Design a protein with these regions (language model features):
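Bacterial N-terminal signal peptides that target proteins for export
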Residues: 4-16
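Bacterial N-terminal signal peptides
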Residues: 14-26
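Transition segments tied to proteolytic processing and entry into folded domains
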Residues: 26-168
């Protein structure tokens, strides 16, 4: 085989491997949804409210199929402070669920809630249930008050709760 042919084959193999690597690395990013604008968030949400996060508990730990990482599932109790949309009133409490995402994922593609914080949020009611979920990964709005606790539990049955509820 001519030396030029050998170099050309080597270059093509290297380029092919690089393209396979590039496509496999960016494929998960291509599947992520675009952020919803304010109008779409309002339209698709069952509830838009200012809430105070009272507690967060770890309800499950499941292995992620792609990363193999053990990821906690959470249940937060939120107290409604103000309502822009929805059938709840100030003082009502509701539950929101979410699952952590693998640490290697770019973005935060999930909304986390931390005890003590007061934040505007957009939620959808889970079908057939009593809990809510974030409408989109960008459903978290303006932070009105920072969290008292920023480390969430990672073992099933553990929970973190604010020390006291401020008086209305």
């Amino acid at each position: 085989m001519h030396p030029m042919e050998v170099r050309l084959r080597h270059a093509l193999k290297t380029l092919s491997l690089f393209l396979v690597f590039l496509l496999s690395a960016t494929a998960p990013l291509l599947a992520l949804p675009a952020p919803m604008d304010d109008a779409e968030l309002m339209e698709k949400s069952h509830l838009v409210a200012l809430v105070r996060v009272l507690s967060v508990g770890c309800t499950s730990v499941t292995k992620d199929e792609q990363s193999g990482e053990e990821l906690p599932g959470y249940l937060a109790t939120l107290q409604v402070l103000e309502v822009k949309k929805g059938d709840v009133k100030p003082g009502d409490e509701l539950m929101v669920t979410w699952r952590a995402i693998p640490t290697g994922i770019i973005g935060p593609w999930v909304v986390y809630y931390y005890p003590g914080e007061e934040v505007w949020t957009h939620l959808t009611k889970r079908s057939g249930g009593v809990t809510y979920a974030s409408t989109s990964w960008n459903a978290r709005g303006e932070l009105v008050k920072p969290a008292q606790i920023t480390k969430l539990p990672i073992k099933v049955g553990e929970s973190v709760t604010i020390t006291s509820k401020p008086k209305e």
